[in-house]
């Protein structure tokens, strides 16, 4: 898969930046109003009852703030957060080590929770439901099961693929929140806030232009701002202006709707080789040289969101909106 400026997935260089930009409270958090308002109520109710917050599942496309919300939940509850991920928990013993290290009320954040192995999920069920851990000591006929009590804790799971979670695991979450793509105005506010942290002057029109091309995703907006800032420092006087922004994004091959060369390759591949579709996913995969799950999970969601692509029982179809974007006429049936 090509390295991608417009990927919502976290890159190595994003880690320190995201930590420094991360809001600490729900009041500071921009966007996701529905999820935020619900969490405010659930957190306040748990604090009034002096209980731990119910387990929370955050799901939606990458880069929308799931990790940030997990940290905010811990801050609002006044507890510590322990962070891990589905791929990092390889054996039941790994999960047991994490669970037994928790303090009362702590938040355990598991990113990519859909990638937990089923055997590990089974260890998690009694931990989530009864705050206890069943472990097997010994082997063979002499093996015996021992139950350990755990302190009450809140599990916050994050996933880009809620449908990949097993039903028993999903049903054990008391709070399910879907994170939606951000509006241009929300992203513009995020870009301006990031500019303040960077101590870089940014024109409000430039912030709006970056927001329009950020695919509804804060992580992408901040990444684009970093690259535009580089152009402003080298090709300008350090101020992020509209002129600098448009020049930088054109050179970075990010068009006015936030589509890049990979989006163009996918859409034009279907248009030019299959008359716009319908065409099967595996055929698209072979045509553009990308794995089918990458196309489905990484490239297609935004194209579906903006109405440039349709998934049908017969395959993928490029819509009239996409033809219009490329200045092309749809083939006559």
From Swiss-Prot:
Annotated SUPFAM superfamilies: P-loop containing nucleoside triphosphate hydrolases, Winged helix' DNA-binding domain
Annotated stretches, region: Head domain (RuvB-H): 256-333
Record-listed DNA binding positions: 311, 316
Positions of ATP binding: 21-22, 63, 66-68, 129-131, 172, 182, 219
Keyword Metal-binding included in the entry's annotation: no
GO molecular function, one term: ATP binding
Broad class of the protein's primary localization: cytoplasm
UniProt xrefs under HAMAP family: DNA_HJ_migration_RuvB (MF_00016)
Name of the protein this chain belongs to: Holliday junction branch migration complex subunit RuvB
């Amino acid at each position: 898969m090509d390295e991608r400026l417009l990927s919502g997935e976290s890159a190595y260089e994003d880690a320190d930046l995201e930590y420094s930009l991360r809001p600490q409270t729900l009041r500071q958090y921009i966007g996701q109003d529905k999820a935020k308002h619900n969490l405010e109520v659930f957190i306040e109710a748990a604090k009034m009852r002096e209980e731990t917050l119910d387990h929370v599942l955050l799901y939606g496309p990458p880069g929308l703030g799931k990790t940030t919300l997990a940290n905010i939940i811990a801050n609002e509850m006044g507890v510590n957060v322990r962070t891990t991920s589905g791929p990092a928990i390889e054996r039941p013993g790994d999960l047991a080590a994490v669970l037994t290290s928790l303090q009362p009320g702590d938040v355990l954040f598991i990113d990519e929770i859909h990638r937990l192995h089923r055997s590990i999920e089974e260890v998690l069920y009694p931990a989530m439901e009864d705050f206890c851990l069943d472990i097997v000591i010994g082997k063979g006929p002499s093996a015996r099961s021992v139950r350990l009590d755990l302190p009450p804790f809140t599990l916050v799971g994050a996933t880009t693929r809620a449908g990949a979670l097993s039903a028993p695991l999903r049903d054990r979450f008391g709070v399910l929140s879907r994170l939606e793509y951000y509006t241009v105005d929300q992203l513009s506010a995020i870009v301006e806030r990031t500019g303040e942290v960077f101590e870089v002057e940014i024109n409000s029109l430039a912030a709006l232009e970056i927001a329009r091309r950020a695919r509804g995703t804060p992580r992408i907006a901040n990444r684009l701002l970093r690259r535009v800032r580089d152009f402003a420092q080298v090709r300008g006087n350090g101020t992020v202006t509209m002129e600098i922004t448009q020049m930088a994004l054109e050179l970075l091959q990010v068009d006015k709707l936030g589509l890049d060369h990979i989006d163009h390759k996918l859409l034009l591949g279907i248009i030019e080789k299959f008359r716009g579709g319908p065409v099967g996913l595996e055929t698209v995969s072979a045509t553009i040289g990308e794995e089918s799950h990458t196309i489905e999970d990484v490239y297609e969601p935004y194209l579906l969101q903006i109405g440039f692509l349709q998934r049908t029982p017969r395959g993928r179809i490029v819509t009239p909106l996409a033809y219009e974007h490329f200045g092309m006429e749809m083939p006559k049936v």
